[in-house]
């Protein structure tokens, strides 16, 4: 938790994992909005993942991942046209997305960071440096 905002991290990176995540989110009581920060490797079924969890998300943010298999937030955004995340802001990396979303969120909201082990590792680094 950061300033009254629940932060959830999930390494799932396929539609099956996203469906399980959506089911879990649906059973958790929370008072506010749900923000999602999503970053995924270029070889993943990003549209299938977003579609599976979309019903649980109020606001989206996309982030880029470095590395040979990574992709920029803009490339991810292009692959998500027509999805619930089509209007999401793009952030250079997970750390900048975490900062931006936590600045926007209010106590009682929850922030989900998901899409890859790389995404969660970058989020953990950002969260630890923010404390």
At which residue positions do the language-model features occur?
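Nucleotide phosphate-binding/pyrophosphate-handling subdomain across enzymes
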Residues: 1-59
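Glycine/Thr-rich phosphate-binding loops of Rossmann-like dinucleotide-binding domains
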Residues: 17, 70, 121-122
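Short helix-capping segments at alpha-helix termini
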Residues: 29-30, 81-85, 131
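Active-site-proximal loop/hinge segments that shape catalytic or ion-binding/gating pockets
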Residues: 116
């Amino acid at each position: 938790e950061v300033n009254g905002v629940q932060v959830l991290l999930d390494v799932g990176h396929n539609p099956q994992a996203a469906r399980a995540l959506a089911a879990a989110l649906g059973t958790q009581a929370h008072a506010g909005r749900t923000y999602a920060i999503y970053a995924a490797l270029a070889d993943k079924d990003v549209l299938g993942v977003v579609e599976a969890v979309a019903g649980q998300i109020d606001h989206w943010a996309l982030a880029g991942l470095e590395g040979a298999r990574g992709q920029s937030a803009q490339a991810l955004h292009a692959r998500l046209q027509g999805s619930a995340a089509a209007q999401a802001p793009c952030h250079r990396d997970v750390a900048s997305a975490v900062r931006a979303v936590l600045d926007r969120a209010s106590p009682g909201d929850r922030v989900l960071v998901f899409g890859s082990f790389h995404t969660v590792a970058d989020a953990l680094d950002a969260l630890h440096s923010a404390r």
